[in-house]
Amino acid sequence: MNGIISKAALEARRARYPAGCRVALVRTSDPYTPLVPGDLGTVDFLDSIGTIFISWDNGSTLGMAFGEDEVRRV
């Protein structure tokens, strides 16, 4: 994936992950995070390049990058 999100994909992502919704981590490309698959968090917002900023229940605030990381709604 080239990491560039289309306007339509960005709007779909915003609709799927609105602020306040709960998510679970599926995978992340960050080798230094303490997050593991299944960890839960709450979506804060999405930025203009599709990164989902999440307040994780473990206290982390790691964002999930479009094309690199994956979460699912719970």
Describe the predicted segments one by one.
Residues 2-74:
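Basic/aromatic-rich interaction segments and small domains that mediate binding to polyanionic partners
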